């Protein structure tokens, strides 16, 4: 590939794994396959655009034809880090290796942490267990409205979430509480990946979350490829929750989104901008609305909707653009429980410059190969981990 690309666009389909990783059993996962099991559940997925790129060339997905001449280079990536959460996946994509997993609290948080929150805020804590946000809001929302107590809960991820009605706990107060929780959980014994403010509105029986969610992540422990790009004078446009995942590090512009389709709208708007660097989009609905809630039909519909938007994306790309579509972990909605699943993730790499289409790339042993390729393209500092496949794109 003689000329470098002016713009690289990375789309992370949050949780869209493509089959069980070799070490899945170590993570308690057996026979997991997000893409495959969704397709089977609905009797085949209709995703012609992803099909043309070469999705079923990676491995066959029911309903999606294998492309005779795939438009994209294709393979799958294996996660090297010791985790299967959003932060671990994204940080590895951008060149980090996470050896010590973020802590999870399947039985709720220790009394010491809860006592600190109550002492600081003057509010009681209710909940303190793993739960779906919508379910715990329905279960404890009325008590919260009556008493002003904070609904604190966790999930299978390394996360502490605080739900509060906007008329009971004003947004600024909720954000301040979450900032305090962030400060006291940065290190052992808690070492939480994220604190999330989960505001809601409405009446008992009809509570609904607002778009004013805010994530407080850990800062990456080392510079990522995003930092290298920013330091090298390149643009890093973070769309969706990307800026939250990296706690703003290495980001030159952040664009919030309200849904997958809003994310695609924002991304398509970014394609109209003249910039030199990377756009980085996370589509969280796959994970948050359908994976954790074990809703394979909803997940399938969201995949089909995403595929439909790729037509607009492809129309806007030029020979100066490189599009990379991948995921950060699995979340098989047909599997037991509500946790993420340890899986390979798809990798599709496309540019209109590939006049003869794409072909199979070698299996990537770490997500960091993606970040290394981006760094290689822009001639910035290479990450410690990862092997660029830029030279394989012809």
Curated annotation (Swiss-Prot):
GO MF annotation list: magnesium ion binding; manganese ion binding; phosphopentomutase activity
Known pathway: Carbohydrate degradation; 2-deoxy-D-ribose 1-phosphate degradation; D-glyceraldehyde 3-phosphate and acetaldehyde from 2-deoxy-alpha-D-ribose 1-phosphate: step 1/2
Obligatory cofactor(s): Mn(2+)
Catalytic class of the enzyme: isomerase
Keyword set, alphabetical order: Cytoplasm, Isomerase, Manganese, Metal-binding
CDD domains: PPM
GO CC annotation terms, alphabetical: cytosol
GO biological process: 2-deoxyribose 1-phosphate catabolic process; 5-phosphoribose 1-diphosphate biosynthetic process; metabolic compound salvage; nucleotide metabolic process
Cofactor note: Binds 2 manganese ions.
Catalytic activity, reaction form: 2-deoxy-alpha-D-ribose 1-phosphate = 2-deoxy-D-ribose 5-phosphate; alpha-D-ribose 1-phosphate = D-ribose 5-phosphate
Cellular location(s): Cytoplasm
Chain residues that bind Mn(2+) 2: 287, 292, 340
HAMAP family reported in the protein's UniProt record: Phosphopentomut
Membership in a protein family: Belongs to the phosphopentomutase family.
Name assigned to this protein: Phosphopentomutase
Provenance organism: Listeria innocua serovar 6a (strain ATCC BAA-680 / CLIP 11262)
Lineage, highest ranks first: Bacteria, Bacillati, Bacillota, Bacilli, Bacillales
